[in-house]
Amino acid sequence: MKVYDVVVIGAGPGGGSAALHAARAGLRTLILEADPEIGTPVHCGECLSELAVQNLDLEIPDHVKALDVRGIRVIFPDGTEKLLTEEGYVLEKHLFERWLADEAVQKGAKLLLG
């Protein structure tokens, strides 16, 4: 039986990022994804600020970026709005999730799909 230091449940943005960081740190990492393919079904878009990208120590490739932005306007369900002026990216979420998992696997993580 293989022993892992880290088991990540789900290969979404949070799980993929956690798996990538664990694998980069040399931890024996297993990613368990219930779906047969990462990034499907596509649920929504994804935005990341440049500060978040830097804090996560990511170098996001151009093919997962849909748009560079200088800010976003968030409209909440109650109709209130908030303007965020940080630079960042709108991402193709399914491509971003696949890229994170691929990077983690390249660093030594094992990926099991449903």
Spell out what each predicted region is.
Residues 34-72:
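N-terminal FAD cofactor-binding segment of flavoenzymes
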Residues 71-114:
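Conserved N-terminal helical subregion
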